[in-house]
């Protein structure tokens, strides 16, 4: 009889029990590390019994395929993370040994979202949360639209921290996903026409949002879709990331047997205190970026604990306590060259800066619109 419903046949069940009995016998005699699983199902079985640390060690490596590419995963901790599914209590955390790709965290965002159709006419705005010498400088600007912005459309006015906003055109779009400009207009200083009061942060208009929960990179990490179908806006101000048409989701083409043992992990990430009100967000994902605390870099804000340091980083650090300095153990490479890699932690005093590890292992930050390296992590659960 065929095994069409995916249940274990008697023979397969016996094989699995034999394998587990071998593991248990080896562990009982202190030789657990000498017997290695031969499948991801074996690995998951050990994790669920709380025996993974008896067979593996922090720093051991496991591999899977993503298409024709072999992904090398470092084991960075055991039972550090909390499975999102409460029926499970154990976890084994993996992180890619090298930077996988370079991905924009978030694109520069829209200034205004049209809850209802915005008729053609003259409007004025006073962008805030910016810089005295650039966008969001406290001045009021006006512009005239010859064409209506439809309901669900956006007004986009990008700029810079150190440049006169008048150097930048204003553009309108029919939706957050549209890349077709309805019209382009020139702003001037002034208070003519109707005031638009519900505006995005000036920092995010120029450089993107540092909110990880709403980020484009988080969506990419947890997508298995083909290029062009990965990104969907998380907020009304979102704009398409630079990679929207040319990157398949991180899970696309990945081994099915590997994905089957990766469970969703509950993660806490602090929010900035400029636009997001401080505090934290909770996410439940298969794949995630590490926080500064998890990388043995201390807390962004003392009131939010973004997980716990993984032994891979705390036990083999160049330092004996959490630090933000150069640390060779934190450096990630791509084709032999050290790279900058995104964290999920924001720089809490800004709405656009995201924390990253630089090429020497130091803590740093930069704008969300940059494309830095990603070294995703996940948990066998």
Identify the meaning behind each predicted range.
Residues 1-22:
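Short, low-complexity N-terminal tether/leader segments at secretion or assembly junctions of large
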Residues 21-381:
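Collagenous Gly-X-Y triple-helix signature in extracellular proteins
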């Amino acid at each position: 009889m065929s095994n069409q419903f995916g249940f274990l046949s008697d023979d397969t069940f016996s094989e699995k029990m034999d394998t587990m009995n071998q593991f248990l016998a080896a562990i009982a005699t202190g030789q657990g590390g000498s017997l290695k699983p031969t499948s991801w199902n074996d690995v998951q079985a050990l994790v669920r019994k709380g025996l993974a640390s008896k067979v593996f060690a922090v720093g051991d490596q496991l591999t899977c395929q993503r298409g024709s590419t072999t992904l090398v995963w470092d084991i960075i901790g055991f039972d550090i993370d909390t499975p999102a599914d409460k029926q499970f209590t154990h976890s084994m955390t993996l992180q890619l040994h090298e930077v996988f790709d370079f991905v924009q965290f978030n694109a520069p965002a829209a200034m205004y979202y049209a809850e209802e159709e915005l008729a053609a006419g003259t409007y004025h705005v006073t962008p805030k949360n910016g810089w005295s010498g650039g966008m969001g400088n406290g001045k009021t600007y006006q512009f005239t639209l010859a064409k209506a912005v439809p309901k669900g459309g956006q007004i986009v006015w990008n700029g810079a921290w150190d440049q006169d906003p008048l150097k930048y055109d204003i553009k309108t779009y029919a939706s957050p996903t549209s890349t077709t400009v309805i019209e382009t207009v020139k702003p001037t200083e002034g208070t003519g026409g109707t005031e638009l009061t519900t505006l995005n942060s000036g920092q995010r208009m120029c450089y993107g949002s540092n909110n990880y929960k709403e980020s484009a990179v988080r969506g990419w990490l947890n997508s298995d879709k083909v290029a062009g179908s990965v990104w969907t806006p998380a907020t009304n101000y979102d704009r398409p990331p630079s990679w929207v048409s040319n990157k398949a989701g991180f899970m696309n083409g990945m081994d099915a047997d590997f994905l089957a043992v990766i469970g969703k992990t509950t993660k806490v990430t602090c929010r900035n205190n400029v636009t997001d009100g401080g505090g934290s967000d909770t996410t439940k994902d298969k794949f995630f970026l590490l926080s500064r605390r998890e990388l043995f870099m201390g807390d962004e804000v003392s009131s939010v604990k973004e997980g716990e340091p993984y032994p891979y980083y705390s036990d083999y650090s160049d330092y004996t306590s959490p630090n933000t300095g150069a640390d060779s153990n934190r450096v990630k490479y791509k084709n032999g060259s050290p790279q900058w890699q995104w964290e999920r932690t924001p720089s809490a005093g800004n709405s656009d800066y995201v924390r990253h590890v630089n090429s020497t292992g130091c803590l740093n930050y930069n704008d969300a619109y940059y494309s830095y390296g990603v070294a995703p992590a996940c948990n066998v659960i």
